């Protein structure tokens, strides 16, 4: 019984420390208020950070091409992802944000398709009204917020089997591989569920923290399309300078890959048709979904002066659909 009381007290103390820390209370003040050492406070905070990293998206965040063979919404814990985003934004606003997203997996995947055409689902995430943020926030604050935002978006995209192609200012361009020819359902539904989770994380994870700290809230528009007219090209080399164990300089050359194609152009263009915190999909993505998933979309009636893309298979204006909620 005494042991249970002790564990309960320690658990309560731990949660109190984390609550105070997440409320931007310095560790030395927490130590003083709770009458424990600052080192113990910092150890508890660090242990929680490591635990969150393990429990968050890491278990499902390797963008291995084979992940496109699975329905990943069932294994992504959106509640943990939201909590992770809250903690990350808190930490970013208090100190230098971390950005540890590796591009090695992207290069490995693209190397397989170099100098060839490949079927891909393209997902484009664009931050709404970033010009207003630039005009209202100091550059260093805006940079910190965008960096934390981008990291969380990258993690959730990877959790759904996507791979970051590149960052374009305030936008993210990602792709999902189609592992079985003409089997579009899984990569398309993973991209759609990813888009829905991105919006949830922004609304329920990032924005509450920004609001509590007096910063403007964020919103995004997302476009998703799929197609087989995507060429993987190599544009030169990235030169990497490193030191070996003996402090001798080593120079490594890593090929720089990019994707060019109609699908990328359509996905980026259709993003502008979405309302804030909504996403749009092309006809081919919509057709790949089941009836229940289709019911969450409505067709967008867009004038030819705004939208004039022609479907490669139909020869008529390519239809786009918007998420309802």
What does each of the following model-derived ranges do?
Residues 10-14:
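Short, leucine-enriched amphipathic alpha-helices that occur as contiguous helical runs
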Residues 224-228, 263-266, 270:
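Alpha-helical scaffolding flanking metal-ion-dependent phosphate/phosphodiester catalytic sites
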Residues 2-7, 19-29, 35, 39-102, ...:
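Intrinsically disordered, glycine/charged-rich C-terminal tails and inter-domain linkers
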Residues 198:
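Serine endopeptidase catalytic core focused on the charge-relay Asp
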Residues 102-107, 204-206:
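Short gly/ser/thr-rich secondary-structure transition/capping motifs
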Residues 106-190:
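Catalytic NTP-binding/metal-coordinating core of nucleotidyl cyclase/transferase enzymes
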